[in-house]
Swiss-Prot record:
<protein>
    <recommendedName>
        <fullName>Ribonuclease Y</fullName>
        <ecNumber>3.1.-.-</ecNumber>
    </recommendedName>
</protein>
<dbReference type="GO" id="GO:0003723">
    <property type="term" value="F:RNA binding"/>
</dbReference>
<feature type="domain" description="KH">
    <location>
        <begin position="198"/>
        <end position="261"/>
    </location>
</feature>
<comment type="similarity">
    <text>Belongs to the RNase Y family.</text>
</comment>
<keyword id="KW-1003">Cell membrane</keyword>
<dbReference type="Pfam" id="PF12072">
    <property type="entry name" value="RNase_Y_N"/>
</dbReference>
<dbReference type="InterPro" id="IPR004088">
    <property type="entry name" value="KH_dom_type_1"/>
</dbReference>
<dbReference type="GO" id="GO:0005886">
    <property type="term" value="C:plasma membrane"/>
</dbReference>
<dbReference type="Pfam" id="PF01966">
    <property type="entry name" value="HD"/>
</dbReference>
<dbReference type="GO" id="GO:0004521">
    <property type="term" value="F:RNA endonuclease activity"/>
</dbReference>
<dbReference type="InterPro" id="IPR006675">
    <property type="entry name" value="HDIG_dom"/>
</dbReference>
<dbReference type="InterPro" id="IPR004087">
    <property type="entry name" value="KH_dom"/>
</dbReference>
<keyword id="KW-0540">Nuclease</keyword>
<dbReference type="InterPro" id="IPR022711">
    <property type="entry name" value="RNase_Y_N"/>
</dbReference>
<dbReference type="Pfam" id="PF00013">
    <property type="entry name" value="KH_1"/>
</dbReference>
<keyword id="KW-0812">Transmembrane</keyword>
<keyword id="KW-1133">Transmembrane helix</keyword>
Length: 508
């Protein structure tokens, strides 16, 4: 049994081995067949691809050959065209050269003819000169001198006539242009101002107030007149009192103080002093505001505060009845407009025009003409040299060296000379009153002085610590003599010297 089993196992092994061998050989043959099939297919594909590539290469070569042949044909055609154009140009140049040669030959012939004619003309000219010398008995040089002299006289006469015509034309054109510039400036500067007066009227609530203003034995009215330096005129005019004085600042102080007293109702010397001080401060503020408004109206910035204050004081100054501040504003506008027309520095012209009369704001207190005072003030407060020069030149105290200085001078003359701008009589009257005060203030010991009663009286306040009661009589006499020597006036002037000693104490 065991042997049989072993034989069976061996036979099974052998059969399995043979079966696997047969299967393996079959797979190998199948693989070989598949490999041969794949190889043959690859060879066929490669052969097909080769044929395709060869075909494409042949087509590309054919296309490139066709393009190259076309390009060669095009280049050949272009060369043929260029050759044709060159041939045409050569033919044209040949023709031009031939024409030029013909013209040169013709020109040479003409030059020869001209040379022959010139020689003939020269001979004829020489013969004419010889004949003229023989007939006139003058040599060539003598005849030339006579001819030149005659021609020179004619030319000089023509030149003189021409120069005269040009001068007249230039003057006419300059005058027309100047009139045009000035008329344009005047039309564009629409300024209006009324003539200043020397009186102010204060309205009263009733006529009983007149008695309160006068006060017991006139002490209130005397205090007002003494503190303000004006005349207070109380007459039959209903419900009104008149403040008269040539200094507008004093008159304004008196007006404001009186209106405040009337409004307050308490009128006595102590209250009057208080209100006058308040009025002075209010007028100072008005002066600063007027200066600032003037600078703003003209368009000027950067003025020193002291110049602003002095400008404001010009509001209370008059020149021949014309308000000096309004006059200065008008001059600034006119000078600026004319500067714009001429292409000059309009800002310098306007600034100098506004400040040209600044010296009039202080010429009561400082000696010298207002032009020099104004220039000194402008220099002190750091104005430019151009502005200072224009101020100095506006009355020809110095020769104007700049266009702006000339324009300020012209604008000043235009503003002052237009009809209705100024009144001589009023200015002469004010100057006479001003002169009276200057004479009184020139004496030692005088504290202040006021010309009142339309210049028929001058009241002088003296310092009691310097002038005693005996000295005031001599002082009044000396002032009277000086007035007689230096001032022309009708009638007589009353000189009143007041010495007042005030002692103040308090009861505790």
């Amino acid at each position: 049994m065991i042997i049989t089993a072993l034989i069976a196992i061996a036979v099974g092994f052998l059969i399995g081995y043979l079966a696997r061998k047969i299967i393996a050989e079959s797979k190998i043959k199948s693989a070989e067949n598949l490999a041969r099939t794949i190889l043959e297919s690859a060879k066929r594909d490669a052969e097909n691809k080769k044929r395709e590539l060869l075909l494409e290469a042949k087509e590309e070569i054919h296309r490139m050959r066709t393009d190259l042949e076309k390009e060669i044909r095009d280049r050949r055609g272009e060369l043929q065209r260029l050759e044709k154009r060159l041939l045409q140009k050569e033919e044209t140049l040949d023709k031009r050269a031939e024409t030029l040669e013909q013209k040169e030959n013709l020109l040479e012939e003409k030059q020869k003819e001209i040379q022959q004619l010139e020689e003939q003309i020269s001979l004829l000219h020489q013969k004419e000169i010889e004949e003229l010398e023989r007939i006139s008995g003058l040599s060539r040089e003598e005849a030339k001198a006579i001819l030149l002299e005659s021609v020179q006289k004619d030319i000089q006469h023509e030149m003189a006539v021409m120069i005269k015509e040009m001068e007249n034309k230039a003057k006419e054109e300059a005058e027309m242009k100047a009139r045009e510039i000035i008329s344009n400036a005047i039309q564009r500067c629409a300024a209006d101002h009324a003539a200043e007066t020397t009186v102010s009227v204060v309205t009263l609530p009733n006529d009983e107030m007149k008695g309160r203003i006068i006060g017991r034995e006139g002490r209130n009215i005397r205090t007002i007149e003494t503190l303000t330096g004006i005349d207070l005129i109380i007459d039959d005019t209903p419900e009104a009192v008149v403040i008269s004085g040539f200094d507008p600042i004093r008159r304004e102080v008196a007006r404001i103080a009186l209106e405040k007293l009337i409004e307050d109702g308490r009128i006595h010397p102590a209250r009057i002093e208080e209100m006058v001080e308040k009025a002075k401060k209010e007028v100072d503020n008005m002066i600063i505001k007027a200066g600032e408004e003037a600078a703003f109206e003209v368009g000027i910035h950067g003025l020193h505060p002291e110049l602003i204050k002095l400008l404001g004081r010009l509001k209370f100054r008059t020149s021949y009845g014309q308000n000096v501040l309004k006059h200065s504003i008008e001059v600034a506008h006119l000078a600026g407009l004319m500067a714009y027309e001429l292409g000059a520095d309009a800002l310098v012209a306007k600034r100098a025009g506004l400040l040209h009369d600044i010296g009039k704001a202080v010429d009561h207190e400082v000696e010298g003409p207002h032009v020099m005072i104004g220039a000194e003030l402008a220099k002190r407060y750091h104005e430019s040299d151009a502005v200072i020069h224009a101020i100095m030149a506006h009355h020809n105290d110095v020769e104007p060296q700049t266009v702006e200085a000339v324009l300020v001078q012209a604008a000043d003359a235009i503003s002052a000379a237009r009809p209705g701008a100024r009144r001589e009589a009023l200015e002469a009257y004010i100057k006479r009153l001003d002169k009276l005060e200057q004479i009184a203030n020139s004496f030692e010991g005088v504290e202040k002085s006021y010309a009142i009663q339309a210049g028929r009286e001058i009241r002088i306040m003296v310092k009691p610590e310097i002038v005693n009661d005996d000295d005031i009589v001599i002082l009044a006499r000396n002032i009277s003599k000086k007035i007689e020597e230096e001032v022309e006036y009708p009638g007589q002037i009353k000189v009143t010297v007041i010495r007042e000693t005030v002692a103040v104490d308090y009861a505790k």
